[in-house]
């Protein structure tokens, strides 16, 4: 019997890095609502009293970026100066240029088309950059996500809910969770440690906060059978968390990549997700790789599946596809690659088409994870390839 501990974290929408991600995706959605052929690479920085939105955007429409940024911060809950950040009085600075023509020429006309080798219309669109992207799925939870990150996200969603619904009216927007799960022979058996840090009003008694967070946030979220008398709880372990949000830390887009994906259980290619239109394979191929891995696991071809796909800038066809099933595969990993090539088109244009990615759907996934979202209907979470994979694999 092999036992090990594994830990993942999540952050609330009021965390400074997530404010930045959410603003970047709100800008993308606002543009896509008017021009779904736009090229968007939007980055954001938030600090004390300041929002800076910068990037390369090519579009025929007009979007009031400062207004989008302020409304996003308002939705999060930073509406008063005493919270450390105020959507109405903070400065908003923008620095926007068009997409580099050197990049655009590779996206607009893929290598295959330039060489006269394009097989169809999909190969007119090249990848927006080089790089490798990973997708992952596991059978250990109903949403096919690792349990540590699934529970960590559930805790931060609940933390935001009890604040917004005024169940715990003394909470403020910034917050984090961390969950350590004990595994026995690869299966989760218990929760070992729960960490919650939440911004709060300065006059609240810490003992009261800890008791109420335990009863209204942790216990309703984590299944009772996963908790025992050895489970440890650290709730605001420093003893005070009044200064938070951009006043406490500078936030940047792309700083919470592991929170956005699989909580460290799978590898990561290094590319951020938020603020990018789907011609950027950092985003679209990461979604496609999750789509592939989830369908492989749901089809019973493996209990765990990690898919890597890689691209060259300006080239439509992936330069490589690889699979790792960690010894859980019902068929060989080589056979899985063959099945993936047969049933999934991983060229950027095909990913955008098949997952219907030219829509304003991105702000919703900018917080609480891009994958395994039972609260959202996401195209990359569909299980529409299961039967075909099973049939082709002979299961």
UniProtKB/Swiss-Prot annotation:
Its main location: cytoplasm. HAMAP family: S_AdoMet_synth1. The keyword Plastid does not apply. One of its GO terms (cellular component) is cytoplasm. The keyword Magnesium applies. This is S-adenosylmethionine synthase. K(+) binds at residue 43. Homotetramer; dimer of dimers. Keywords: ATP-binding, Cytoplasm, Magnesium, Metal-binding, Nucleotide-binding, One-carbon metabolism, Potassium, Transferase. The gene is metK. InterPro entries: ADOMET_SYNTHASE_CS, S-AdoMet_synt_C, S-AdoMet_synt_central, S-AdoMet_synt_N, S-AdoMet_synthetase, S-AdoMet_synthetase_sfam. It is an enzyme of class 2 (transferase). ATP binds at residues 15, 174-176, 240-241, 249, 255-256, 272, 276. CDD domains: S-AdoMet_synt (cd18079).
